[in-house]
């Protein structure tokens, strides 16, 4: 038989099998575009802006639909009601984490972000309790953030009002807070070890959000046989793991179980308490993975939000003026901002919320997975199915936010100028997998931004009306374009 005929028959069989699986096997998956054999729907997805592709598909197939990334189905929840129904109302059923091939190679399902089941529940519970209750012994986390805010201000003063790219400085501050929480001590901004650590994380974030890595996750065989930036990701993670391992060894040698100094000490003490438990999840491997997760989640996301936030404030000087007036009235010039100030600063609070809403940092959330067979509305979603929840569709909902594509702190203010909460505000996701570092990130954003605006006037290099705040969307996240500004001492 002609090889071409054989190939066509095989592809046809694969297509029929794919369609059969979509409509049988215990029920019916949500509707969606017809997948091609092997390729699935990847030709209908723009991997430079996945969120836009999902928006277009939702107009055709509704708020719950299925796309095939290669041969694997992914169910998409679009809009507030669908996202809430999945992540909150059916929180346990949708609390799994879809482990991509890249993540399988990097952390093997360890840690807290990409783990599942008993491991995830135990590590997450421990991490939350440690970060929440620790007050870190003698010093609260707020103390550490305030210290870093003062260091950030001093570092910005060293620019002497000259034009600068704020990317590094705004990345160093949240990274140092994590260092303080994890390792007890912060680093000098010019410390070579600190610079290397930040460099590895930043490079990995850039690569992991590239279209090439999205393709590698769909066709993992490419990683085994082709050169590419995925190799750099593995090398960088090895560097970070070795760094954490060295720090862990130092902690083991000086550990005082009655006086834990930081997160690593608390984890090591927990390991000692469970040393006779053969099924314990508290191992050196899980410690390294968890610390790496905390770094990854707590550094780049906050720094990107800060950098984008300053760009928006330069674009909208009328907003900046109102925030600075509120800072002057409530805090003044002679003390550092603290979290107690926030309740008396509704406009500033609304501005921080609006920055997060507008930039829509992680448009499609971190992928979830079903933990069991789920009947969702009139559909059947098998256990282990990947689930994407569109945060864009919630944060930019035009019923909740009157001008969703415009930057306007009024979205979070009532008619009297008081701060107004919104159930649609979920930049940290929602439900059982809500970002573990949400409280810390909110604290950092408020304290860092108020400290900067208390001490400096933001001076753009171009007219505010010419500033481009259009997000650069790449793979799984959005960020601001590179820019320079001057920090003029107030």
UniProtKB/Swiss-Prot annotation:
Gene Ontology BP annotations: organic acid metabolic process; xenobiotic metabolic process
Listed EC numbers: 1.14.14.1
Catalytic class of the enzyme: oxidoreductase
Catalytic activity: an organic molecule + reduced [NADPH--hemoprotein reductase] + O2 = an alcohol + oxidized [NADPH--hemoprotein reductase] + H2O + H(+)
UniProt key word Ribosomal protein: no
Known cofactor(s): heme
Tagged with keyword NADP: no
Function, in words: Cytochromes P450 are a group of heme-thiolate monooxygenases. In liver microsomes, this enzyme is involved in an NADPH-dependent electron transport pathway. It oxidizes a variety of structurally unrelated compounds, including steroids, fatty acids, and xenobiotics.
Name the record gives this protein: Cytochrome P450 2C14
Upper classification of the organism: Eukaryota, Metazoa, Chordata, Craniata, Vertebrata
